[in-house]
Amino acid sequence: MLTRKIKLWDINAHITCRLCNGYLIDATTVTECLHTFCRSCLVKYLEENNTCPTCRIVIHQSHPLQYIGHDRTMQDIVYKLVPGLQEAEMRKQREFYHKLGMEVPGDIKAEILTVKQHVEAHRNGETKTDEHTHKEPPEEKQEEDHDYHRSDEQVSICLECNSSKLRGLKRKWIRCSAQATVLHLKKFIAKKLNLSSFNELDILCNEEILGKDHTLKFVVVTRWRFKKAPLLLHYRPKMDLL
């Protein structure tokens, strides 16, 4: 089989963010046109605009953040193509928490450890996947299975109903992983209220509809940065946006 080498420079245009001109971090794609950007760059841009930065198509007149989604496949591709990028990003996150005097969340610790193991394996020439290399001891596997993200950074939430068409939750105060998404909350509320579909719900923060792929950590940082816990979210029946 014939193979040829391709320079990273030749594909840079496909794996960089048009807004910051850096390699994609937390890749996020516009569902309407499929153009991809760094999540932080795109969200900041959409706070004052409602069009795609690349093709200028209108994403949505009033709620463009509802029509973007995390692109895990693209992010995996970028990390595999750019040597050291994922390791550098994990190091930045670790330094960020240390600078604030905060403990690094368990999920980030796990990702940092995975990256280190991957880098060390390549340095040692272990390019082939070994069945025994990535197997975890039974005790560690069992402990991980029963952790349920309790070692993650946690977020305290108050879920309030702001519609007469839905009833309030009996227990509106919850605490969960910062990596949980708005979609997880929708499913939780739908289950508690016996709704036929979680898609019938909108969840809002500061009267702004949140995208289903937004993590709670992202919501806290961008919508609740200077406010005290708990994070106050409201839910209501889904409204069709024109």
UniProtKB/Swiss-Prot annotation:
Subcellular location: Nucleus
Zinc finger (RING-type): 17-56
GO cellular component: PcG protein complex
Species name: Xenopus tropicalis (Western clawed frog)
InterPro entries: PcG_RING_finger, RAWUL, Znf_RING, Znf_RING/FYVE/PHD, Znf_RING_CS
Function in brief: Component of a Polycomb group (PcG) multiprotein PRC1-like complex, a complex class required to maintain the transcriptionally repressive state of many genes, including Hox genes, throughout development. PcG PRC1 complex acts via chromatin remodeling and modification of histones; it mediates monoubiquitination of histone H2A 'Lys-119', rendering chromatin heritably changed in its expressibility. Within the PRC1-like complex, regulates RNF2 ubiquitin ligase activity.
The organism's place on the tree of life at top rank: Eukaryota
Cross-referenced Pfam families: RAWUL, zf-C3HC4_2
Ranges for region Disordered: 120-149
CDD domains per UniProt: RAWUL_PCGF3, RING-HC_PCGF3
Protein name: Polycomb group RING finger protein 3
Main location class: nucleus
Assembly and binders: Component of a PRC1-like complex.
Alphabetized GO MF terms: zinc ion binding
UniProt keyword annotations, A-Z: Metal-binding, Nucleus, Repressor, Transcription, Transcription regulation, Zinc, Zinc-finger
